[in-house]
Amino acid sequence: MKNKIDYSIYLVTDRDLMSTNTLEEAVEKSILGGATLIQLREKECSSHDFYETALKIKKITQKYNIPLIINDRVDIALAVDADGIHIGQSDLPATVVRNIIGEDKILGVSAGNLDEALKAQKDRADYIGVGAMYSTGTKKDATSTTMSELKEITQKVSMPVVVIGGINKERIKDFKEINIDGLAIVSAIIAQKDIEKATRELKEEFYKIK
């Protein structure tokens, strides 16, 4: 399964921004609109609530055969048997996480520059999330990555590259000359009134540059 992952439209959840009553509803609407990968990101809730939420979201992702990635929490990812885990530079080292989760699970690593990207590849990551490409309200402490840095990363790593940070419909064309594999999106999907329509439009714009 790992080699056939479609990274095109990668929803990263944020319950503080969601336009729906429940996270499950937001996730399902995004999948119906064409989301190809879901990352469950829960920074504020207890471990118990994160676990319960992950089980609910997994039911939806399984229904549509969409991979579920857990942000940061290796224990939650293993507890619910998620498809993978995404870690940042301040989380557990990627080599340690790979040894814990094994080779069959997806391992994603955030990378803000070429050195971090090359290290993630050496540490056996399956993909990297590069950014923040633009300033973003969801991660106020994120340092930005330039287009030239992104281009160099895509030329020097041999794994899928997903961009993140302030991505919206209007900005997708900025990546036309760069060989990226997907868009990791938060507010441009989950905060929209019509999540399904917003996701569909993002996917249409992404395919225009592929």
Swiss-Prot record:
One annotated GO biological process: thiamine biosynthetic process
Binding site for 2-[(2R,5Z)-2-carboxy-4-methylthiazol-5(2H)-ylidene]ethyl phosphate: T136, G137, T138, G166, V186, S187
HAMAP family tied to this protein: TMP_synthase
Amino acids binding 4-amino-2-methyl-5-(diphosphooxymethyl)pyrimidine: Q39, L40, R41, E42, K43, N71, S110, K139
Any GO CC annotation of this UniProt entry: cytoplasm
Cofactor: Mg(2+)
Record function comment: Condenses 4-methyl-5-(beta-hydroxyethyl)thiazole monophosphate (THZ-P) and 2-methyl-4-amino-5-hydroxymethyl pyrimidine pyrophosphate (HMP-PP) to form thiamine monophosphate (TMP).
Binding, Mg(2+): D72, D91
Similarity comment: family membership: Belongs to the thiamine-phosphate synthase family.
Pfam families tied to this protein: TMP-TENI
EC numbers for this chain: 2.5.1.3
Keyword Transferase: yes
PANTHER family: THIAMINE BIOSYNTHETIC BIFUNCTIONAL ENZYME, THIAMINE-PHOSPHATE PYROPHOSPHORYLASE
Name of the protein: Thiamine-phosphate synthase
Gene3D superfamilies attached to this UniProt entry: Aldolase class I
Cofactor: binding details: Binds 1 Mg(2+) ion per subunit.
Name of the encoding gene: thiE
Pathway it works in: Cofactor biosynthesis; thiamine diphosphate biosynthesis; thiamine phosphate from 4-amino-2-methyl-5-diphosphomethylpyrimidine and 4-methyl-5-(2-phosphoethyl)-thiazole: step 1/1
Reactions catalysed: 2-[(2R,5Z)-2-carboxy-4-methylthiazol-5(2H)-ylidene]ethyl phosphate + 4-amino-2-methyl-5-(diphosphooxymethyl)pyrimidine + 2 H(+) = thiamine phosphate + CO2 + diphosphate; 2-(2-carboxy-4-methylthiazol-5-yl)ethyl phosphate + 4-amino-2-methyl-5-(diphosphooxymethyl)pyrimidine + 2 H(+) = thiamine phosphate + CO2 + diphosphate; 4-methyl-5-(2-phosphooxyethyl)-thiazole + 4-amino-2-methyl-5-(diphosphooxymethyl)pyrimidine + H(+) = thiamine phosphate + diphosphate
Organism listed in the record: Clostridium botulinum (strain Alaska E43 / Type E3)
